[in-house]
């Protein structure tokens, strides 16, 4: 049985890496290893709010798939356009993979968020099955949209050697696109309270709306301490993790937080918000949008050697519990197998 996988057009764009794109690509690689035939269908467009041309291209792609076939749709492509997807639901076995509920993206005008939310609900109710990338996200989707069942299939990790770090204390790393949802402003404000101790912090990720963060860094005089590195993938990203002493992610909302497990796979201590499923007991979970909590945690990190040792130990323990991408793919392939043709 061939699995048709509908993906956003930028799934392999190195200038816009995202957790969703990495999940899609790694699952495809593991499905191939497991002997599942996958046909990739990439649809360029400004998803989830595409042009008429992109909608027509998606409709055409779905129309070209034989009746009864299994189609896995990335939610970024599917959820905003139920008028395209729903008419095909009767003849195709549709599985929608939701990386982030559309209305959860920070900074959307309320009217746009409401429209996307309604579109997503219509699309998910028409699907044969819905998959979320964490238990929290599965519960949220089921409750919010009134769905009977949402499968939770968490991202895998790649085995990696433990990070050597820099000096065990001073090199901080944040891997996240510069968008309001990722909370870089919270981290900058917190870092501004600990300028009396030596540290540098690398911000790795595409600048989708980086202007306000740059302004805030300049306002606090931290341009010589915070490096805006831009997007990294492959070996350069591996090097960034390997030299990190502490990983920090101040997100306002995450469905899972794959970058957290990438840090934990290397035994890097983590201080983060909005990532309970990814973090487990592997680090310190803080409330989102809480500058004071992040400032206090950073102060403790820099001044309390025993606590640093404890965080490191917790990260190394969590490292042994993380699942692989092959396990993720094996779980995912069982979902459409349960759907009747």
Task: Give residue spans per PLM region.
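Membrane-proximal helix-turn-helix segments that form the acceptor-binding/catalytic region
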Residues: 102, 111-130
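Conserved donor-binding/catalytic core segment of Leloir-type glycosyltransferases
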Residues: 157, 163-182, 188-192, 202
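Glycosyltransferase donor-sugar binding loop
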Residues: 175, 200-214, 230
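Nucleotide-activated donor-binding/catalytic signature segment of Leloir-type glycosyltransferases, i.e.
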Residues: 213-232
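Short alpha-helical donor nucleotide-sugar binding micro-motif in glycosyltransferases
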Residues: 231-232, 239-244
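Aromatic "clamp/platform" in nucleotide-sugar-dependent glycosyltransferases that forms part
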Residues: 252
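Short hydrophobic beta-strand element within catalytic cores of glycosyltransferases
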Residues: 269-272
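Conserved acidic donor-binding segment of nucleotide-sugar-dependent glycosyltransferases
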Residues: 283-292, 300-305
């Amino acid at each position: 049985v061939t699995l048709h996988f509908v993906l956003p057009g930028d799934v392999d764009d190195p200038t816009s890496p995202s957790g969703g794109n990495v999940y899609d690509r790694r699952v495809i690689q593991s499905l191939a290893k497991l002997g599942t035939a996958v046909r990739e269908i990439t649809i360029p467009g400004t998803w989830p709010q595409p042009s008429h041309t992109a909608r027509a291209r998606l409709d055409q792609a779905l129309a070209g798939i034989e009746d009864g076939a299994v189609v896995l749709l990335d939610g970024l492509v599917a959820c905003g356009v139920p008028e395209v997807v729903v008419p095909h639901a009767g003849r195709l076995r549709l599985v929608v993979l939701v990386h982030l509920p559309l209305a959860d993206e920070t900074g959307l005008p309320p009217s746009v968020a409401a429209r996307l939310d309604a579109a997503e609900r219509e699309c998910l109710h028409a699907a044969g099955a819905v998959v979320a990338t964490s238990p929290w996200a599965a519960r949220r989707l089921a409750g919010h949209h009134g769905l009977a069942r949402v499968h939770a299939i968490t991202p895998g990790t790649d085995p990696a050697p433990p990070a050597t770090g820099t000096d065990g204390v001073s090199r901080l790393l944040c891997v996240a696109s510069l968008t309001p949802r990722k909370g870089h402003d919270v981290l900058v404000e917190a870092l501004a309270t600990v300028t009396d101790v030596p540290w540098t912090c690398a911000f790795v990720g595409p600048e989708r709306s980086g202007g306000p963060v740059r302004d805030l860094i300049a306002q606090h005089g931290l341009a010589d301490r915070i490096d805006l590195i831009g997007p990294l993938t492959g070996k350069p990203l591996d090097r960034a993790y390997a030299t990190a002493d502490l990983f920090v992610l101040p997100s306002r909302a995450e469905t899972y937080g794959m970058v957290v497990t990438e840090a934990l796979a290397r035994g890097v201590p983590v201080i983060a918000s909005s990532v309970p499923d990814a973090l487990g007991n592997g680090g310190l979970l803080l409330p989102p949008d809480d500058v004071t909590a992040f400032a206090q945690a950073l102060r403790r990190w820099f001044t309390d050697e025993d606590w640093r040792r404890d965080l490191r130990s917790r990260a190394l323990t969590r490292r042994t519990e993380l699942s692989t991408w092959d396990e993720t793919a094996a779980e995912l392939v069982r979902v459409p197998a349960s759907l009747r043709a």
